[in-house]
Each structure stands twice: as structure tokens, then as C-alpha cells.
Amino acid sequence: PTVISMANHAYWNLAGSDSIADHELHVPAVRKLVYDEFQIPTGITDVEGTPYDMRVSSTLGPILEATGGLDDCYLLDGVGGQLRPGAVLSHPGTGRVLRVLTDAPGMQVYSGNNLGSPFHVHQSMSLETQRMPDAPNQPALGPCVLRPGEHYATTTLLDFTTSGT
């Protein structure tokens, strides 16, 4: 047996600028993981009424200011194994839109809090569809073990458009 949770850690900045603060992010998730000081999940919380609530498209600048940066796993609603919306990242100034569809149960939203040279903090962000972090140590977070003879597959679609299309 082996633990498996493949994720794509590509970074996105739809404006090609020095900051994602003017981007908008929509994450249609009601819940996210809660972490301790070592970024180990300790539970699940609702996002309603918090800066982490992006069920309505929100400008990232105020969110980054309120949170100090995002590095959070959202629990995506919907039926496991079926494609569903994970996120929409957009840049109003250019009209560029990235839609993420996935069959994964979670999505880590990371705002580049620790980017180093030649990049800098919050210059881009990653939208990582995946299984739950630390699931091997916390079975309540869902399955993550692939046993001999089993098959693992996951699908994430990245759809690029411009506003109005």
C-alpha cells in the first residue's frame, strides 16, 4: 500500500503583474480545514462570516490583508468522483478568467506567502486540487491509501476564457 494524493502546484497571475491583489477569486465551498501552528489540520470549520468565505467572487487584496495570506484547504461540495466547480480566478483589468473543475474532494488555495527570489509574496497563487492533507494520520479526512491491484485516477480541468465568452 502507498499513500497517494497527486496535486498540481502551478502558479497563476492572470495579469502578469507583481501582485494578485487585484484578482478576484470564487471558491464555492462552505467549509475549510483549520490548522495548528505547524499547518497540521486540527478540524473543519464553516467559512461563513470569515475572510475565507469566497462563495461570492471576492477581490483578493482585502482577503490577503485580513488573513496574512491564504494557505488553506477547502472541502469542495458535490459528489466525489464527479467533476464540479473548484474555483474561478479572474482579473477584471484584463478580462482573463481561469475556471477550475475537479473530481477531487479538496482544493488547497495558496497565495504565494513564501515565494522567494526572483518572485515575491502574493505575486501569484496556486489552486491545488487534491485529497485532504494529513489524511494518512486522520482517517476522518477521507481515504488516501492505494492498495495493490487498485487504480488511482483524478481529473482536474483548467478552462481559460475572457470575460464575455
Locate the predicted segments by residue.
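An exposed, glycine/acidic-rich loop-and-rim segment of catalytic or binding clefts
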Residues: 1-165
